[in-house]
Amino acid sequence: MEGHVIVPLEKLSLELNNGGIMLNHDKDISALQEEISALRSRQRHLDHRRQEALDKLIDLKGSIRVFCRVRPSISANNFMTKSPVTVENEKIVVRAVGIKKEFSVDRVFDQESTQEDVFQEVKPILRSALDGHNVCILAYGQTGTGKTYTMEGNNGKLGIVPRAIQELFSHASQDSSSTYSFSISMLEVYMGTVRDLLTPRQPLFRSTECNTSSIISILATKSGAVEVEGLTDVAIQDLKKANQWYCRGRRARSTSWTNVNDVSSRSHCLTRITIKRSSGGTTEECSKLWLVDLGGSERLLKTGASGLTMDEGKAINLSLSALGDVIAALRRKRSHVPYRNSKLTQILSDSLGDGSKVLMVVHISPSDDDIGETVCSLSFAKRARSIESSKELSEDIKKLKQKRIAELDKEICDAEQELKDLNEQIKRAETSLEERKKLSSSACQALSDEKGSPRSTLVVVGHIDSAESPQATEKTKSRASHGSVPHFMSPTVCSRQRHSSASHSATKTRLTKSVNRYPAAELSGSHSFSYSSCKNAAKARSVAFSSSMPKMKCLPLKSDQINMSNNSIDSTAASAPRRRESFISRPAQRAPLHQHRRRMSSLT
């Protein structure tokens, strides 16, 4: 392969760029990186637009929304009699003897509504929690109306809490523009005392004196954020772990038997999901999602409670009244909000105020026996919603409102679909980028391995004339000649210079002798000859010599083309001093180590 440039046999296209070689893979990698950067910029823009539309939608519907869910009839006799509760889309009418009351709410779920129907209305507010807003979802109502069923579910019919946790993890796995981390905490407010439900299990019996190790305190920062000191906060990496910790906490909740409910909650159960979100180089956002299963409002005469159970009922009613005061003050935008009237409202203070989203699901019973409790629960909902039935919006305004809500819903759906498509494009681009990087890394490794490796697979991609680069040819041949010679036996720079000058002198001498062999008649005319003729003759002798000595390798002769006259040749031959003949070091003809003319002392 003498006189050629050799490169690794790879499917690589090379081009000279500013005097260097640049792989086309690098261009592909740069193009893919620019494409991913543009896609992520578009993704952030769409996500910001979706957040704005969602905030407008929630504000239009109301930052504090009140739903009502009617429990299915339990007694067989109730199916035969007409229920006193009549349900419309946003209105509930309660009829009794000589009484008819109407209550307006944001949405009514009748007796045939499913867990999925309820959760679909909860989904938008969960997106606000992922966007960085504090969110609070509460289940309120009389004992035995299905609050715990709505929040927890049973028999495979998941409630709001497990569905919300599942939705959070599902969205986090699909959103490639942000990184999410979640943690869970559970506590209960039992008779004005806060208990941690994720600590080691407490004794099964209820006591008015709680364990000192489970007492935690509530602290408020200058910015208004609430910190529950001493509360267990468990990081959850997947849905399975989250469900395990949630089941552990709800099993530790205080319950008791009453005349109304066999398993009556005797406390307020609060589940907190802390969401931390980081998007690129921006600062980390932290938000809280509170899922609250409130204790049942009850009348002592109906429940038949006494002793400790009666005290628990009183504590529940007091905290529910304080919660109603807080929500009413917030809806009316009063300057003072009485958060400190209850442990419950004190804990939820930063998730009920400005910038937060609140959703309350009020539960009622369709039974005639529960008309009194139904009216009380709906009055609480009316107070929280702070809208009088006589001051309902006109039909035209309602239509405009519904039209605007539909437009915002469509805008959110379009943005979410486009975000989904962008996520797929980003994933494909990132996959291609990884493949290009691996291919480029493999190519660079192959080039590094083949450098100086004579056994590498090589291919000729170009030809270089030896006359144009004699130094490169000489170096290549020199490395080939001395590749197997030990370092201390290889020729030095001075010896190579002597070899070169001696070879040049010997060439001139052979040329002089060859000229003297020609007759004088052949030199008549110009009395000169070109160096190329002599060079051809020298090549012929070199070929003959190489055939007799196949293992010997000589360096190529390098000389400019010379025109010499007969007289100059004679004078040069006569005046040239006799030099000691020198040969190139050859592995096949090198002298034994003890006869080498270099001093061995220089090796130590």
Swiss-Prot record:
Chain positions recorded as ATP binding sites: G141, Q142, T143, G144, T145, G146, K147, T148
Keywords annotated in UniProt: ATP-binding, Coiled coil, Microtubule, Motor protein, Nucleotide-binding
Residue ranges the record marks as coiled coil: 22-61, 383-443
Domain Kinesin motor: 63-387
Any GO CC annotation of this UniProt entry: kinesin complex
Domain of life: Eukaryota
Annotated Polar residues bias: 565-574
Gene Ontology MF term list: ATP binding; ATP hydrolysis activity; microtubule binding; microtubule motor activity
Biased composition (Basic residues): 593-604
GO annotation terms (biological process): microtubule-based movement; spindle assembly
PROSITE patterns xrefs: KINESIN_MOTOR_2
Region ranges (Disordered): 465-511, 565-604
Similarity remark: Belongs to the TRAFAC class myosin-kinesin ATPase superfamily. Kinesin family. KIN-14 subfamily.
Protein name as catalogued: Kinesin-like protein KIN-14O
Source organism phylogeny: Eukaryota, Viridiplantae, Streptophyta, Embryophyta, Tracheophyta
Annotated gene: KIN14O
